[in-house]
Amino acid sequence: MLKLIDITWLYHHLPMRFTLAVERGEQVAILGPSGAGKSTLLNLIAGFLAPASGTLLIAGEDHTLTPPSRRPVSMLFQENNLFSHLNVQQNIGLGLNPGLTLNASQREKRDAIARQMGIESLMARLPGELSGGQRQRVALARCLVREQPVLLLDEPFSALDPALRQEMLTLVSDICRERQLTLLMVSHSVEDAARIAPRSIVVADGRIAWQGKTDELLSGQASASALLGIKSHIL
């Protein structure tokens, strides 16, 4: 579904280089130390950064040079980027038409995703009138209403309290499973990764240093566990 072949980004003339394959419907966590290149990897996939070399394939098509607006990808950031002067209904509608002129089918899609996110009663409110969790639900709805096959999450729930964060992770995981979306999620928490992603990759020094089962990483038995400060539970 998603394949990166030696995708290279030059950071202060030092190369970050990624080779990765992710299957359709797979949920993968991206972990690693601060500054390792996790967000860079997502931005290369989304098209916000242009690689110096390499190839990026999505569903077998070459999207290495495709602009972000035309890539079959949606991305959600920690900063939800909602427009403060637009209400919830309009912010979601932007995912369907930047001009907010929606036909009947598009309006039904907008309303359906609002119901699924549990925000249908908030449609007339402005972002400033919402809680942090509600704003992230709106931002997630705007991503999902675009119906792209790849969803990228760059720590969008890290500012939420633990209970709400777990609720949002479960919601995302369920929706991705239901729609067979391919999910890549950057996180600093291996515990969060274990809730949503059976597979993890660890990025270090601009490379994929390890990839495998999240449970193995969490147990401390993986070679990359030490990079994340995880100690083996075996005495």
From Swiss-Prot:
Localization: Cell inner membrane
Bilayer disposition of the protein: Peripheral membrane protein
Key words, A-Z: ATP-binding, Cell inner membrane, Cell membrane, Membrane, Nucleotide-binding, Translocase, Transport
Domain ABC transporter: 2-230
Entries under PROSITE patterns matching the protein: ABC_TRANSPORTER_1, ABC_TRANSPORTER_2, THIQ
InterPro entries referenced in this protein's UniProt entry, alphabetically: AAA+_ATPase, ABC_SmlMolc_Importer, ABC_transporter-like_ATP-bd, ABC_transporter-like_CS, P-loop_NTPase, Thiamine_ABC_ThiQ
Pfam family, one: ABC_tran
EC number from the UniProt entry: 7.6.2.15
This protein's GO CC annotations: plasma membrane
Catalytic activity entry: thiamine(out) + ATP + H2O = thiamine(in) + ADP + phosphate + H(+)
GO MF annotation list: ABC-type thiamine transporter activity; ATP binding; ATP hydrolysis activity
Annotated residues for binding of ATP: G32, P33, S34, G35, A36, G37, K38, S39
Domain of life the protein comes from: Bacteria
Role description: Part of the ABC transporter complex ThiBPQ involved in thiamine import. Responsible for energy coupling to the transport system.
Similarity section: Belongs to the ABC transporter superfamily. Thiamine importer (TC 3.A.1.19.1) family.
Subunit note: The complex is composed of two ATP-binding proteins (ThiQ), two transmembrane proteins (ThiP) and a solute-binding protein (ThiB).
Name assigned to this protein: Thiamine import ATP-binding protein ThiQ
Organism of derivation: Salmonella typhi
This protein's encoding gene: thiQ
